[in-house]
């Protein structure tokens, strides 16, 4: 069993401490010998030119340390592909996640590692273009910590961490959010948070084992959305509501206990990006867009006009020869 911790925090900081506590508990709870690895996103080298998502195939041993800017994306992707269970942790910075996490997501994962797109390539007889490990079942746990003691200062951390791995079809089985960790080692002083991190690690190990015997299930705290178990929603019509985290569709209602609840059904749940059906719907939308007619001469003329304006107005930074 291979466990991977991915930290978006500082070396030895509160986020890393929480990940290590969870990983240690996972190692102890694992029914088979466990291999533990920890990657610090702040230590990865990802050049600005890497945002096109191009990675050599297969990725094993393909990290480029000799180019103008070292590219560690193949290294981290190989770690992910080998993992059976992953814990992704990040601190809360200005109510959201650090830029290193988003850069890692956009340059390494996203549509470039989409399990639905990969399956389409295989079905089209182009399996040689796909790293077959992408189809491996994996479980994921999420951890976020912030300095504030109140929820309004950390609304986007867990919802955004949910976006990192869903293209891979990785199943989230637990998640935790810790408040009041704004100074070094404050996580270690929070005995309740330590106990919760260890519980999360054990849950991850148990559900990773479940993938070998059947299907893993979510065992973390329950939220209003039955899919992602968070409680952030978009009101997209007079009555229509969408889960802002995963995209499940439904409406708001009042339960028998008098509390507001999110009401959905199997059709509404099928739009969730955490469901394979949601990924397929998105792929169909993209394919429909690709079938649009080519640009007209008028559109091309406007495009060229705007490009010329951009060339005359852009201000280059010193690193690109600017003053």
UniProtKB/Swiss-Prot annotation:
State its cofactor: FMN
Q: Which GO terms describe its molecular function?
A: oxidoreductase activity
InterPro entries given in the database record? Flavoprotein-like_sf (IPR029039), FMN_Rdtase-like_dom (IPR005025)
Report the transmembrane regions from the record.
none
| Knocked-out gene: effects | Results in the accumulation of intermediates that all bear a hydroxy substituent in the C ring and lack a double bond between C2 and C3.
List the pathway annotation: Secondary metabolite biosynthesis; flavonoid biosynthesis
What function does the entry list?
FMN-dependent oxidoreductase; part of the gene cluster that mediates the biosynthesis of chlorflavonin, a fungal flavonoid with acetolactate synthase inhibitory activity. Within the pathway, cfoJ acts as a flavone synthase (FNS) and catalyzes the formation of a double bond between C2 and C3, converting the flavanone into a flavone. The pathway begins with the PKS-NRPS hybrid synthetase cfoA that uses benzoic acid or p-hydroxybenzoic acid as a starter unit with four rounds of chain elongation using malonyl-CoA to form the chalcone skeleton.
This protein is called what?
A: Flavone synthase cfoJ
